Amino acid sequence: MSTADTTAAGIEHGTHVSETAAHPQPSPSKGSLSTFLSTYVFSKDHKVIGLQFLFSTLLWFLVGGLLALAVRWQVAWPWSDVPVLGKLFAQQGGQMSPEFYTMLFTMHATVMIFLVIIPVLAGAFGNFLIPLMIGADDMAFPTLNMLSYWFMWPAFAAFSASFFVEGGAASSGWTSYPTLATNVNAAPGSGWGQTLWLVGLTFVGVSSMLGSVNYMTTIILMRAPGMTMFRLPMTIWAMFITAVLQAFALPVLTAAGFMQLFDRTLGTGFFTPEGNIVNNAVATAGGGQPLLWQHLFWFYSHPAVYIMILPAMGMVSDILTCFARKPLFGYRPMVYSVAGIAGLGFIVWGHHMFMSGMNPALGVTFMVSTMMIALPSAVKTFNWLGTIWGGKIQFTTSMLFALSFVSMFIIGGLSGIFMAATPVDIFIHDTYFIVAHFHYVLFAGTAMGVWAAIYFWFPKMFGRTMNEFWGKVHFFLTFIFLNGTFFTMHILGAVGFPRRLADAYHYETFHHLQPLNAFMTYCAIGMVATQIIFAVNFFWSMFFGPVAGRNPWNANTLEWTAPSPPGHGNFDYQPVVYRGPYEYSVPGVEQDHLMQTDPPHPAAAAAAAAAH
């Protein structure tokens, strides 16, 4: 059929044909280097950029995971020869020095937070899914979209290079607290390594800001005909609210980062107090307040917690409804709860600072606001349970990961209640209880959501499905090793095991905990090794997996009306939306789902009228 015939057919069926569908892009000549670069490297197509983010974050996830194993090795068996890293850096004859240990946990957290969790959620899935799920051809600003990806690589280069400069990588924690971070002579890693850390953080911030502006504009202005805001899937609502969080919180961290950089290089004194001495190094300027950095840093970094989990919540909501074959329980309350979590996220940052010396009355205020955030979180949790209750559950790999996301989020949320109370926080502050909490929320929670999303949208990305058997093997082994690693941390934290010491067994009271740490390290090694199964399944399925149709899961949302994988312009015709995203098991309808593009169904309308 010719383009003109296709256009006419689209108009005849009551749809509007997109510009890219009516006027396809000319096919570039094969074998051209410039064509390859513009198509696969410096592409402006949202789908290619999303996959670039996905492949890059999987690489950075490997780097962050190996750094984590090195940290776990030192905690379990301090002063023993470290495999691989010991030979690579020759630290004290193959053993890890305390200074290098602090560099490792600093860079592990930096890589995992700024190069893995945030970009895989907002960058990979946000880019790939937003235009497809709202019925758009592409992002509003394709060039900015491309730049948002390429700004991540200078950040990775800066973080990586910091290991090879004089003094080594940053060692003041991913929080970069003054005055350790502002005094260039304070400790190994406080010199060029810390400066490169701040430079890398700036590039990450620019990337995130470009993405957030693009996402908000695209969702507001480029929705398909009939796609009202309350017909958007929860994935899009979560991405939209996450973009709002980034747009309002990120400038604060960026400004604070520049202020700290100026303290280090230009002699200003924003965060350095007068006469400050760290490790016999006297500060060259003074008059600043270290507490100011904490307020500015956590004003961004607590909303960043929700930037790192809200997209996963949205994607899990869509996956649960699909495989429970039921509508989402309480769609509008779910939307309002996401907005409530985001709003409260801006007024709870002080719970990270209960032990910082701030006014205790202010601490009580932050304690109350922190406990309030449990309300919208509980709404989401019970609505997820209501969604799957009584459903015709299909236990696919994606569904298993989605269900485990809910359980991991519950565990992480319950442990957070302990830390929200200032009297309790006095005892568990800076212990492994804190480490257990944020790993359950940000790794056990978010990573489970990411794996669920990969298995779910893989057919749309590559036109093939992943192997379900090996996917379930990957799930069960990951679930076992993950909980073996992180649940045990609650026990360590409850008895006061400190989180940042290279050798806590220097204190006799912790000697009996070494077997627990060894057990956790074995589980961590098993968890990392299990990802080999995922990697083989992922890349094998890309080329040899079973061919998927447009809608292998019988889902409802717009991306499943596009070809798998979608071509340039995404859709054959401009989709028109007639209904919400969760019309599963509709009374009076033979099939168990109605897609958003299905016109009003007479039988369903009659059944609804009879019900009233």
Give residue spans per PLM region.
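Membrane-embedded and interfacial regions of multi-pass energy-transducing membrane proteins
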Residues: 2-612
